[in-house]
């Protein structure tokens, strides 16, 4: 079939009349229009607060903007999201995968299997970095940025959005990055939008230069009739001349308008009072989403499911395992020892122990395990998911066509729930072990059978207590998992949001435990 020349000439991105109003009524973008042609590199410059990040969110996080109360209106946004790729600040490499895994994930979801080493070589990196086990944490800033470029290229995206790609790079690496962008655009027929403050990068790559004006809140083309094109292949004198002119234009604009506050519209976005209650329902929506997506992800993407689940199991069970073992034994010993002393004079401790049996384990293990699990294990997973959002790894997943709900939420939810069930069982065993020490101290015979009877073979009048304990373990497991994933996976605009999410989850899950303890006690008693 012969390609349609008209289709090839159509803009990769065509935005007309874009207007974005913040929830407080400030107009951050007004009548923005931009078309990016095939093979073209467009650079967007602007000061802080000019709307560069907001424009990025319109392209990649439109639904999140709507949920946050932004008013986003455009006459036209023509864009094939299947062709749009993102290179976030500092690369946003997936830290739970090695270098090879980052590239393989992109290729799997693009249904384009290939050798990761080839893509590393294409961006000027040592192919040896594709060896299994090479951690992304060991890469320099320049290497990480190049791996991020290789990852998006391997996903076969045709329109690249590079968000401040030169942050943290020295001038030499900025020059290399500019050369890399131009080389890949030419070699693969790509288009690119580069958002930057770096005039060296801007001059090196731009076919056209735009300023997001703090005065008019729209794009204004710089040097429209004069700009000779990307400076990367130009003589140093010409390059230096245009870099100075570009820097002067940007500084002049910032000097005049840098402190300008965004204007407010007379018509604020409509109030949505139900948004206040949205966080309360989020854990239940996460549970429903995870239940729906987990079976499909497990069957179709077994490797990805196992990778994320293994990470969460390590955080929630394997690493804190010694802590749970020690604490449960100490609590088991302390509780039974105190019980043995409450009878007072004339009451033999061993008689009290035989009377209480393992009831203390049945009554206390679910709640104690839950509270400790939330504070230790739940906080670890909450922090990891939060850091994924904060460092834009979650956004990078979605930009590669990887549904972060299926890839992250579903396996994390399953692994967190199963980890709590395992921790609750371990906690019960630890409390029994502590009780065995007390029984040994008082020479209580058949101590194992005595302390485990209420769990393994309870008397008829105590069956309901064992059933209550089993029910609580089950309800705590999935309630905690839902809240941890919901709060960890919520948007994280700044670092403090990660710690707030952790604290909120501890509070919410503790209230969840207390409520179920009280409710079930009333039913059982």
What would you call each of these model-derived segments?
Residues 90, 97-111:
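Q-loop/switch helix immediately C-terminal to the Walker
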Residues 113-130:
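Conserved ABC ATPase "signature" region
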Residues 135-139, 143:
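Conserved ABC ATPase signature
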Residues 149:
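Hydrophobic anchor residue at the start of the ABC signature
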Residues 160-163:
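Catalytic Walker B motif of ABC-type/P-loop ATPase nucleotide-binding domains
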Residues 196-197:
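H-loop/switch region of ABC-family ATPase nucleotide-binding domains
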Residues 215-251:
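Conserved beta-strand-loop-alpha-helix hinge in the C-terminal portion
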């Amino acid at each position: 079939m012969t390609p349609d020349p008209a289709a090839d000439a159509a803009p990769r991105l065509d935005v007309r009349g874009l207007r974005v109003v913040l929830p407080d009524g400030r107009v951050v973008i007004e009548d923005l229009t931009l078309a990016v042609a095939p093979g073209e590199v467009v650079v967007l410059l602007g000061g802080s607060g000019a709307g560069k990040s907001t424009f990025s969110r319109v392209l990649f996080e439109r639904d999140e903007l709507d949920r946050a109360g932004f008013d986003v209106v455009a006459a036209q946004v023509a864009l094939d999201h299947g062709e749009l790729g993102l290179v976030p600040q500092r690369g946003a490499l997936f830290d739970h995968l090695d270098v090879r895994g980052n590239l393989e994930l992109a290729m799997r979801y693009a249904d384009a299997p290939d050798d990761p080493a080839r893509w590393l070589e294409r961006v000027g990196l040592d192919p040896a970095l594709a060896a299994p086990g090479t951690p992304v944490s060991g890469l320099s800033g320049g290497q990480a940025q190049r791996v991020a470029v290789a990852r998006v290229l391997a996903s076969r995206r045709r329109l690249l959005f590079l968000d401040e790609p030169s942050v943290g790079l020295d001038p030499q690496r900025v020059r290399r990055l500019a050369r890399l962008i131009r080389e890949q655009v030419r070699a693969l027929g790509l288009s690119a939008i580069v958002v930057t403050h770096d005039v060296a990068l801007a001059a090196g790559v731009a076919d056209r230069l735009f300023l997001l004006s703090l005065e008019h809140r729209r794009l204004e083309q710089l040097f429209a009739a004069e700009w000779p094109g990307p400076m990367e292949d130009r003589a140093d004198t010409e390059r230096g001349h245009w870099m100075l002119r570009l820097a002067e234009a940007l500084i002049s604009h910032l000097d005049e308008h840098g402190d300008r506050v965004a204007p407010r519209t007379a018509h604020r976005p409509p109030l949505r009072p139900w948004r206040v209650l949205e966080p309360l329902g989020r854990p239940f929506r996460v549970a429903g989403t995870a239940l729906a997506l987990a079976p499909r992800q497990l069957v179709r993407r077994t490797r990805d499911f196992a990778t994320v689940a293994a990470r969460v199991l390590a955080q929630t069970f394997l690493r804190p395992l010694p802590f749970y073992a020690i604490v449960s034994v100490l609590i088991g010993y302390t509780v039974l020892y105190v019980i043995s002393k409450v009878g007072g004079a004339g009451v033999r401790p061993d008689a009290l122990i035989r009377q209480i049996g393992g009831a203390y384990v049945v009554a206390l293990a679910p709640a104690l395990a839950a509270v400790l699990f939330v504070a230790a294990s739940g906080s670890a997973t909450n922090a990891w998911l939060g850091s994924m959002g904060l460092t834009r790894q979650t956004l990078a997943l979605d930009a590669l066509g990887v549904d972060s709900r299926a890839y992250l939420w579903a396996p994390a939810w399953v692994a967190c729930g199963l980890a709590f069930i395992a921790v609750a069982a371990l906690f019960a065993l630890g409390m029994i072990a502590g009780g065995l020490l007390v029984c040994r101290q008082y020479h209580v015979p058949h101590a194992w059978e005595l302390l485990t009877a209420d769990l393994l073979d309870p008397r008829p009048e105590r069956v309901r207590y064992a059933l209550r304990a089993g029910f609580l373990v089950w309800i705590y497991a999935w309630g905690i998992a839902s809240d941890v994933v919901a709060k960890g996976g919520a948007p994280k605009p700044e670092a403090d949001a990660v710690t707030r999410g952790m604290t909120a989850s501890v509070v919410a899950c503790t209230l969840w435990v207390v409520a179920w303890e009280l409710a079930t006690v009333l039913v059982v008693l």
